[in-house]
């Protein structure tokens, strides 16, 4: 018996949600290998038609895009392609004309809330201007908020529909008006953590009965294997290495980390902070680093193919970020046994004083937490052991998704 599943995601770049989707697709492919009774025929449609992770797509997954470019939206060429895609979709089926009242009304609502987010408006344009597929699917899955959620709700024929939520819904700027109540059209909604679930249900309380936590899937054995491969830090620095992994975006609050590093250097000279990731905030962050004289101390290392040898060689993992859901980077750091410092928004993953330190997202608080951990080797070792024990693999969550096919 074959079951047709369509996944839709906004882009296929190197962010945490996209990596989690690849792990989920690989898991479904392995399910196909285990049994012949039920076979999943899996398709993927990428709304923007771009992203560098396409090369890691499992071989049995059918990419539905008529045209696709393996370009990162963080690169110049990738951004140009993105702008062309947006312009093109504006004129497909008269999208802009049809959406004009919605766009004007939503923008006015944003102005009233003093939170204008043009990207949120563009997701509706991209959704309505996207490709159309005639076939009906047994299950259609929107793997991100915004465009993919709108697209499946309005433009995909499926017996069952499911949507994933990866972020703090209200802090990210979404509203029911912006969504056009799209989540009322879904049979199941999967926030990736309990905190994410509670924030979502504040906006959509009537969806409580169909909303269940579905944790990010990570392959711990693959992470450990890749951590043992050649790579990692290439400098000859012999001091304490702090590591952060994440795209250079406003959401990640890197200015807080940079200013915290300035305070750390006032007390400790033998420490460096490395960031793995690329993004639109690079120039602004470089300017701040230069202005504080931290060129040799706060290192923007860019994106790397295999970050795990860096985790393995780091002394402390620091995750001082703004709003997001459940961090895959923290899960990876726990898998490799790093002591972790994180901002208070990560309470679901870190128990303060038990398997890491939680602190306010302020330079003073972050610097105090880092200095405390740097100065206490026994504390670092205790948190290392706790991180290794903390890592949990959520195998049963798969049944939440595949179970929809038989209801």
Task: List where the protein language model places each region.
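A conserved mid-protein helix/loop that constitutes part of the nucleotide-sugar donor-binding site
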Residues: 18-23, 240-263, 280-286
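Glycosyltransferase donor-sugar binding loop
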Residues: 44-51, 245, 249, 272-285
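Donor nucleotide-sugar binding/catalytic pocket of nucleotide-sugar-dependent glycosyltransferases
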Residues: 160-166, 170, 184-225
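A charged, aromatic-enriched C-terminal amphipathic alpha-helix characteristic of glycosyltransferases
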Residues: 228-229, 361, 378-407
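Aromatic "clamp/platform" in nucleotide-sugar-dependent glycosyltransferases that forms part
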Residues: 303, 322
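Short alpha-helical segment that forms part of, or immediately flanks, the ligand-binding pocket
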Residues: 308, 326-335, 347-348, 354
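Short hydrophobic beta-strand element within catalytic cores of glycosyltransferases
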Residues: 335, 339-342
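Conserved acidic donor-binding segment of nucleotide-sugar-dependent glycosyltransferases
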Residues: 352-353, 357-364, 372-377
């Amino acid at each position: 018996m074959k079951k047709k599943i369509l996944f839709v995601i906004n882009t296929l770049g190197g962010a945490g949600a996209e990596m989690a989707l690849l792990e989920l697709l690989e898991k479904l492919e392995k399910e196909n290998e285990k049994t012949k009774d039920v076979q999943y025929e899996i398709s993927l449609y990428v709304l923007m038609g771009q992203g560098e992770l396409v090369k890691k797509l499992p071989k049995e997954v059918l990419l539905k895009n008529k045209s696709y470019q393996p370009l990162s939206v963080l690169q110049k060429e990738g951004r140009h392609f993105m702008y062309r895609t947006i312009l093109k979709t504006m004129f497909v089926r008269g999208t802009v004309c049809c959406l004009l009242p919605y766009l004007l009304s939503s923008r006015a609502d944003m102005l009233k809330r003093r939170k204008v987010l043009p990207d949120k408006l563009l997701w509706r344009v991209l959704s309505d201007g996207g490709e159309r597929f005639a076939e009906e699917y047994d299950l259609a899955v929107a793997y991100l908020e915004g465009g993919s959620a709108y697209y499946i709700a309005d433009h995909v024929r499926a017996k069952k529909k499911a949507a994933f939520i990866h972020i703090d819904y209200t802090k990210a700027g979404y509203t029911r008006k912006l969504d056009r109540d799209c989540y009322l059209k879904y049979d199941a909604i999967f926030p990736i953590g309990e905190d994410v679930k509670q924030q979502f249900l504040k906006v959509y309380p009537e969806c409580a009965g169909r909303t269940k936590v579905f944790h990010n899937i990570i392959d711990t054995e693959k992470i450990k294997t890749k951590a043992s491969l050649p790579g990692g830090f290439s400098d000859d620095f012999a001091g304490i290495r702090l590591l952060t992994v994440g795209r250079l975006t406003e959401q990640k609050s890197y200015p807080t980390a940079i200013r915290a590093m300035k305070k750390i250097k006032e007390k400790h000279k033998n420490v460096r902070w490395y960031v793995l990731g690329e993004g639109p905030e690079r120039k602004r962050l470089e300017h701040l680093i230069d202005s504080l004289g931290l060129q040799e101390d706060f290192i923007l290392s860019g994106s790397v193919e295999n970050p795990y040898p860096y985790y393995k060689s780091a002394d402390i993992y620091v995750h001082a970020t703004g709003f997001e859901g459940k961090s895959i980077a923290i899960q990876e750091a726990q898998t490799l046994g790093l002591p972790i410092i994180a901002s208070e928004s990560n309470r679901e993953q870190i128990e303060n004083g038990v398997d890491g330190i939680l602190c306010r997202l302020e330079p003073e608080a972050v610097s105090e937490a880092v200095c405390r951990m740097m100065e206490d080797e026994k504390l670092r070792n205790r948190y290392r052991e706790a991180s290794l024990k903390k890592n949990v693999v959520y195998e049963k969550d798969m049944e939440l998704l595949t179970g929809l096919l038989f209801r």
